[in-house]
Design a protein with these regions (language model features):
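A cross-family signal for N-terminal binding/gating loops and helix N-caps
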Residues: 1-232
Length: 232
């Protein structure tokens, strides 16, 4: 599959890249998981809407927010069920024993139903299959032609400061007002602010009420800080 080959090539280029390029590669991988791939497992079709990159390379990318599980190494295109923390499912993209790399499926559509990180494993296990059954599957990434507008932000609920300011989340902007993304609102504030400032620059006579309506249209909610942003 050409798209899996594209992912593989990006992963292979990651290790020797400079930091800024590493972040860009992780963003590109996230973008491709959302727009170019769907996941097919035991009759469940998963469409990623919000994915977060977790990578650990001791020398080149020591992110201690990564679980550093053996299941995050050299299992390209396979699932990893979290062994600790909140619970969740990742897609491993590491193609080497030298480093961990996986993408948390933070928000998805599973057979058309919106699921958050902790809901997805419950739905998968309701099929009667075990975690091991899912983790043994190969070739689960299939071509998709989604046309989402992709944006980036920081990762949600990190427990360590490593790379906490890095925009290692890819998300489908057009999905935000359609589904319940309340878990992400803190991380989305900077995206809302940047969007609103650009909107006000393009519409210099807009009122606060118009700005609030635009925020609600695009992001599905209006942060408390909108009034401050508008009047400053």
């Amino acid at each position: 599959m050409d798209r899996a080959a594209d992912l593989w090539t990006l992963v292979s280029n990651f290790k020797n890249a400079a930091y800024d390029e590493q972040v860009h590669i992780l963003q590109m991988l996230g973008d491709k998981l959302i727009n170019d791939c769907r996941i097919e497992v035991f009759g469940v079709t998963i469409e990623p809407l919000w994915v977060e990159a977790y990578c650990y390379d001791e020398t080149h990318f020591p992110d201690y927010n990564t679980h550093r599980s053996r299941k995050q190494k050299n299992r390209f295109g396979q699932m990893y069920f979290h062994e600790r923390g909140y619970g969740g499912v990742d897609i491993c993209l590491s193609n080497s024993e030298d480093f961990c790399l996986s993408f948390l499926l933070k928000a998805t559509l599973a057979n058309g139903h919106f699921l958050t990180q902790t809901q997805l494993p419950c739905v998968l296990l309701s099929t009667g299959k075990t975690k091991a059954d899912f983790e043994h599957l190969e070739d689960i990434l299939h071509p998709a032609n989604a046309r989402h507008t992709i944006c980036h932000t920081t990762r949600v609920n990190l427990t360590k400061p490593c790379y906490s300011d890095a925009p290692l989340t890819s998300f489908a902007l057009d999905a935000i007002p359609k589904y319940d993304f309340r878990f992400a609102r803190k991380n989305l504030r900077e995206n809302v602010r940047a969007y609103l400032l650009a909107y006000m620059a393009a519409h210099p006579d807009c009122t606060e009420q118009e700005c609030r309506a635009e925020c609600r249209r695009v992001f599905g909610w209006v942060p408390d800080l909108v009034r401050t942003w508008v009047h400053n």
